[in-house]
Each structure stands twice: as structure tokens, then as C-alpha cells.
Design a protein with these regions (language model features):
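Terminal processing/anchoring signals of secreted or surface-associated proteins
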Residues: 85, 231, 466-471, 486-487, ...
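Beta-strand-rich modules
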Residues: 431-451
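C-terminal tail/sorting-segment detector
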Residues: 3, 465-466, 499-516
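Residue-level detector of functionally pivotal "anchor" positions at catalytic/ligand-binding pockets or at interdomain
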Residues: 339-354, 449-489
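N-terminal glycine/threonine-rich, aromatic-flanked beta-hairpin/loop signature
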Residues: 52, 57-102, 211-259, 392
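Solvent-exposed loop/turn segments flanking beta-strands in beta-repeat/beta-sandwich domains
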Residues: 368-406
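Tryptophan-anchored aromatic micro-motifs
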Residues: 27-69, 85-89, 192-221, 232-233, ...
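Beta-sheet ligand-binding and adhesion/scaffold domains
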Residues: 106-199, 251-343
Length: 516
């Protein structure tokens, strides 16, 4: 066997290249090399499985492996005893099918097979493909070796219909010389999957509610039939996703691991959780993250139609591990009443303020604008505007300082953004300013039926930083850093499993695990 050279290619080197799937115009123009991957779904019977594996990937120069759970395993069986596996590499989306042959209940995937293509431009402005290949890599005490003598893996079709890899060798992504690129999967396991999304009966009473958590404010539909409550649109990317709860008096219980649908390459699940400290024995380190629970329980105010919980739920990839895209911590849901008059809105809540400095030439204010009035009733963002006050005076903003503005403005719509100095993310608003000021204030205005009602002006004192204490305690963030799980510091844009450390004004820190 040839000893495998571990060719370190960063995630940017592979991920930064345009794939043939992503650039149709460039594919049409390519003229120096025919395509070799199987990019179109082959003819035959398509089956979808719940896939698990161990996935290896290059985390900016660090070889990293993770347990992959809930991957959508697409497999095609044709009438010539051939079996095709789609996107067999969990950590590099290759838009390709690998072919195997089935004999009895054994599927054998012979390699090398073209598995990944990047589209490149040569010095003569001609497009060409660089092709990467699937090969078998053996894992042993010395590391990894390319198995050129028995370059295949086998999977067994079990009596229950599952497809399970034999042995623990890796199907790896290599260059044309057989050098491993630090992407691959082993312990492939395809389980039959037939879960369905809960559906509210047509006879259920359906109303619009608002789902709040942190700076998130999502409009959802709540349907009630008997002792069942159905909540849809909990994932903005998956409007079909529905979670079902059981009403028990003044409580509503939502069980964990409810199927929500496919989200990209993964099956998505509703997972209940609580925040806590977790020990990672692989790296002898503690970090804070969510711990899975059996259910999330909401307090239910039936008269005012409100739900509130001190726990959390996650929109999770897979159901075995905590691996989430969106988390709703301490969520609340409120019925959206039809307004009859303008009411006093809640005031702004400052998150952080960076004072203006001459060296940078700018300052930054981050604040939340609640979509509620002082009575706790939901307000539509379309009714809300806000104004900023610099050193106690209403500030007018114009194109002289804000190049993306086309006119002078002193009042902004709730969702206004110029995508340069003014940004909005849910209820969180970020505003860059170019004045050397001592205080900054925010006033919220609720307008309905031709009448406007204003909130109190919430002021942040940049000199003493007392304003933030009145609003958010000592939670001002002063720094954020990222490391990979091997302990190496990385940039905020790094893909993979990272540890995010947040440093607060009082010197305290909080470390969480994030997936990008």
C-alpha cells in the first residue's frame, strides 16, 4: 500500500471554487475537459434514509471529525443491480452520485470514482474542471493509508431495510494522485425514515401569534383543536414546519424530537433543551451549551392567549445530538390582537454602544426595539417608527454623512436599512454614527388610526456608561473570540464546530459551542 500524503487544502481552497452545479453559465463555457462526475439523478427507484456517519473535514489546517446525525441519505436502485449514493461526503457538498453494485444483500462501491469538480479559469480565460476522486482510506495506528490494493468499501442491506457499512475504513476525497484532502466519511449507516410532520385538523381554530426570543420576533400560526396546539412557521426557512403541544390546564407541553422536515442536507427536528455546562472528554474542556430534555413546558394564559417558558427549544439538525441552526431561549408567544387605538410602545433596550473615536471615525449603537406596548400586547412593525437623540437633541441624518440616504431623515421605519450604516435583524437594530457625542437616546413611536403615541426616550450615557445599567444590567459585550475545538484561535467566519467566547463589561466570560 502507498503511504498516504496528507495534503492540507484549506476549506477556502475547496469551498471557494465555484462548483459546476452552482455556475451553469460557466459550465456551458467550459471547453477543455468533459465532466466526469454523475451530476444528474440516475434512473431508478429513489429512497431517502436517515443517515449517520463519522465525518472528517479540514478546519483551517486542523483535521477534525464529528458525529454526523440526521443527514438526508438519498439512494437510487436501478434495474441493473446498480446502487447510487448522493452526496456521500457530509462535510463537502459535492452534488454527485457515487455508483455501487449490489450482489445479494451486499453493495460494493469500487474506487476511484470522480466525486467532486471545481470550475477554474486558466491564463487564457478558458474554463476547465479540476476533478477530485473518492478513494478508500484505511484507518490504523499510524494514521491513514490509501488502500490501492482493495480500493472499495462494502455496505450490507439488513433485514429491516437499513444499509450499514462493513468495517470502519473511510471513503475519502482525494486528488488525482491519490493524496487525501482531509474530507471523508466512515461508519456509514442508512436507516429507513418515514416520519411525518404534524398537521392541524381542518376544523382547528387558527390565529396569528408572535413568537419572541432574544431579538427574534416571528409571526406564527397557532391552531387549537381540543387539547392539541399546533404552531407553524417556527422556522422562517421552513414554513411547513409544525410543532404540536398538549394543553393541560394552564400548561402546554411540547415533546422533543418532533420532525419538522428537510432543511438543506439534514432532517430538522424540534428539540427541547436547557442551558448548562458540558464537559468534553475528548479535549478535557468545559463549555456552555444546550442540553437536550424530554419536553419544553410553557405557562399558558388562556384568557390573554399567551405562552411563556423559562426553557428553550431548538431547530435541530438530526435528533441524537444537539446541533442546531436556530435556538429560541426563554421563548414567549402572544396572540396578535386587532388594534383599536394607538397605545404606548415599550422603550428601546440598548445592547451595546461603541463610543465615537477619531482614530476609527465612527461609533456604533446596537439596540432592540420591542414589538409590544406597555400592556404587553403585540404591535405590528408597520405601526412603529423610531428617532435618535444626540446629546438630548433630535438628530437629523442626511446624505452628507450617510451616503446611502437620498434625503434628510429624522424618523425611521421599524425595518428600515440602508445596508451600510443602518441594519436590522429581527428586533435588533445597529446604527453607526459619526458624531462625537456624550449621550444617545432612542424614542419609539406607535401610529394607528391617525394618532401617534410615543415611548419614553431611553438614553445611554457614553461617558459614564450608566444608561446601559438601567436597561440591561452588566451585559454589555466587550469582546468576542473564536477557537476550534482543538483550541486554536480562528476567525469569526470559519466554518465548522467552534467555541465562541464572549467577554462582558464586568470581566465575566461565556463560552458556547456554535456550528457554522
Amino acid at each position: 500500500m502507498k503511504k498516504l500524503l496528507l495534503t492540507i487544502i484549506s476549506s477556502l481552497a475547496l469551498g471557494g471554487m465555484a462548483t459546476a452545479q452552482q455556475t451553469d453559465a460557466a459550465v456551458a463555457a467550459a471547453d477543455t475537459q468533459p465532466r466526469k462526475i454523475i451530476s444528474q439523478q440516475p434512473d431508478g427507484e429513489l429512497k431517502e434514509y436517515y443517515r449517520t456517519s463519522t465525518g472528517y473535514y479540514n478546519n483551517f489546517g486542523t483535521l477534525t471529525h464529528v458525529d454526523v446525525d440526521g443527514y438526508v441519505g438519498k439512494v437510487v436502485f436501478d434495474d441493473r443491480k446498480r446502487v447510487y449514493f448522493y452526496n456521500i461526503f457530509s462535510k463537502v457538498y459535492n452534488y454527485a452520485w457515487l455508483r455501487g453494485n449490489i450482489d445479494g444483500n451486499i453493495i460494493r462501491i469500487d474506487m476511484p470514482q470522480a466525486a467532486y469538480e471545481t470550475l477554474n479559469l486558466d491564463e487564457n480565460d478558458r474554463y476547465y474542471y479540476t476533478v477530485y476522486y473518492a478513494n478508500k482510506v484505511k484507518v490504523n495506528d499510524d494514521g491513514f493509508e490509501l488502500d490501492s490494493e482493495k480500493n472499495y468499501i462494502e455496505l450490507e442491506v439488513m433485514e429491516d431495510g437499513s444499509i450499514v457499512q462493513r468495517g470502519d475504513d473511510m471513503i475519502a476525497l482525494c486528488d488525482e494522485n491519490g493524496d487525501w484532502l482531509w474530507y471523508g466519511d466512515t461508519h456509514l449507516n442508512y436507516q429507513p425514515f418515514d416520519s411525518t410532520i404534524p398537521t392541524a385538523p381542518k376544523t382547528a381554530v387558527t390565529e396569528e401569534w408572535k413568537l419572541f426570543s432574544g431579538n427574534m420576533a416571528e409571526t406564527v400560526n397557532v391552531s387549537i383543536e381540543g387539547d392539541r396546539m399546533y404552531v407553524d412557521h417556527i422556522n422562517p426557512e421552513m414554513p411547513e414546519a409544525v410543532a404540536m403541544g398538549v394543553i393541560e390546564g394552564d400548561k402546554v407541553r411540547f415533546a422533543t424530537d418532533q420532525y419538522l422536515g428537510q432543511n438543506g442536507a439534514y432532517y430538522s427536528f424540534f428539540k427541547s433543551a436547557v442551558w448548562g455546562e458540558i464537559y468534553d472528554d475528548r479535549y478535557d474542556t468545559y463549555y456552555e451549551d444546550y442540553k437536550a430534555t424530554d419536553e419544553i413546558v410553557f405557562d399558558y394564559d388562556t384568557a390573554r392567549k399567551r405562552l411563556k417558558s423559562s426553557e428553550a427549544f431548538l431547530l435541530n439538525y438530526g435528533k441524537s445530538d444537539v446541533f442546531y441552526k436556530i435556538d429560541y431561549d426563554k421563548p414567549s408567544l402572544k396572540f396578535i390582537k386587532t388594534p383599536t387605538e394607538a397605545t404606548k410602545p415599550l422603550g428601546a433596550e440598548f445592547v451595546s454602544v461603541t463610543p465615537y473615536s477619531q482614530s476609527k471615525g465612527w461609533g456604533e449603537a446596537v439596540f432592540n426595539l420591542p414589538q409590544e406596548d406597555v400592556n404587553g400586547d403585540v404591535l405590528s412593525p408597520s405601526q412603529l417608527t423610531y428617532q435618535l437623540y444626540f446629546d438630548g437633541e433630535l438628530k437629523s441624518f442626511g446624505p452628507d454623512q450617510y451616503e446611502r440616504l437620498v434625503r434628510e431623515m429624522d424618523t425611521f421605519g421599524y425595518n428600515f436599512t440602508d445596508d451600510w450604516d443602518i441594519f436590522v435583524d429581527g428586533s435588533k437594530h445597529t446604527f453607526y454614527f459619526y458624531d462625537d457625542i456624550n449621550t444617545i437616546g432612542v424614542k419609539v413611536i406607535n401610529t394607528f388610526g391617525g394618532k401617534s403615541v410615543e415611548s419614553d426616550i431611553v438614553t445611554y450615557d457614553l461617558a459614564t456608561q450608566t444608561g446601559i445599567d438601567d436597561v440591561a444590567g452588566s451585559s454589555r459585550v466587550t469582546g468576542v473570540s473564536y477557537t476550534n475545538i482543538a483550541g486554536c484561535r480562528v476567525g469569526a467566519g470559519t466554518k465548522g464546530i467552534l467555541l465562541k467566547t464572549v467577554t462582558y463589561q464586568d470581566g465575566s466570560t461565556r463560552t458556547v459551542k456554535v456550528a457554522r
